[in-house]
Amino acid sequence: MTAVTAASGTAVPRPIDRWLDEHGEGLVALRRNLHAHPELSGDEQATTDLVYERLQLAGLEARRLAVGTGLVCDIVPTGSAAGFEGGLALRADLDALAMADEKDVAYRSQVPGVSHACGHDVHTAIVLGTALYFAHHRDELPGPVRFIFQPAEERVPGGALDVVSDGGLAGVAAIVGLHCEPKLDVGTIGLRAGAISSAADMAVIGLSGPGGHTARPELTVDLVGLAAKVVTELPGRVAAAVAHIDHDHAALVKVVFGSLHAGDAANVIPTHGAIKASIRTPSLAVWDVLADVFERELHSIVAGSGAVVDLDYTHGVPPVVNDRAVTHIVGEAAAAALGASCVEEVQQSWGGDDFAWFTREVPGAYVRLGVRDPHGPTLDLHAGHFDVDERSIAIGVQLLTATVERFFAGPAEA
């Protein structure tokens, strides 16, 4: 398997390079197996079983989470009697999305309406590959490492909270996670100290009225028209209401609608409408008031229409805030394993990830892994044709093994 790394041409292959030469294609096959058999948040039974079995075959003990899906696995150095204290955790998320896989490939999803369009299959293959490497190279392991295979990242407020409540961070001194980044070419590692993602909330808006004939909308509540008004006016109103709170960001909030449904017939005004929205902000100060602002502005739009509004607002995940020292360690590891030119500073994104709950408990680094084929199209996350350059799997394993080695080597020089 050919990896895109600056270090691949060194005269003396490293142990991880030799291991990937032997096992890299197996990791790609594993990823394709996961890709073809995706499971939704909380339903990752087969995925959990597969990871558990692979760990067992390597002589490792894993513990399933109390929620039924997901697991953790500790590896400690040979001869260590200290137990798991001061360890490094590496996290992968297991779940897929409720959307169709539109690719024409052999490993296309075999589950209708479910696909790995966010790269969690890649994350799982990388973290599992790193665990399998250290299972056979314990003599190279400088300290205890916990491998976290987390369920339900896509379900607000996220399965990371289940890991935390299940003691998944006990004894952990720092945590590192990576995520596929289709805007970066394969072989590129994106890093950022401080906030690297945004807070992400969700809302379901219900609108109801008496219904009636479209010939006489003045005698009832025009729910379709009202829903359209909510969709067109609410984003601007919310943005204006929070504009004074934080002056450190060019934009403070995005309200984007993913679903709108009201009625089925052209000549019938419906009695019910439903709107689903995501609400995102890069600012913690804005996030603290966002639910109240959203509700107030929604009711302001609906007021006087005669409709009844029902709001189910879910406070989701905060921004992921990367620890400067841990991020520096990952950067040094990436430069050593892949070459300094492979490391790139990235901007804070509007995406959200429940990895944020981990970084509220222990110092951590959330890393963006380039997966774009330089000669192919850019395929965005959560899109039906999303796919990755599979050379990124070996690169991810190289990065994480180097991060483990660098983490236990001592304090980073900032």
Ranges and model annotations:
Residues A89-R91, A100, A203-I205, Y366-R372:
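Non-cysteine beta-strand/loop elements that form the S-adenosyl-L-methionine
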Residues M1-A7, A228-A414:
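Metal-dependent amide/peptide-bond hydrolase catalytic core
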Residues E39, D93-D95, A152-E154, E181, ...:
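Active-site beta-loop-alpha junctions enriched in small/polar residues
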Residues V12, H23-G26, L30, D43-R54, ...:
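General structural feature for long, well-ordered alpha-helical segments within catalytic domains
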Residues V72, L97-M99, K103-S115, D121-V122, ...:
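Histidine/acidic-residue-rich, glycine-tolerant segments that coordinate divalent metal ions
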Residues V4-H116, D121, A125-G143:
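Acidic/His- and Gly-rich active-site-bordering loop/insert found
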Residues L34, L90, H120, F147, ...:
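Divalent metal-coordination and catalytic microenvironments
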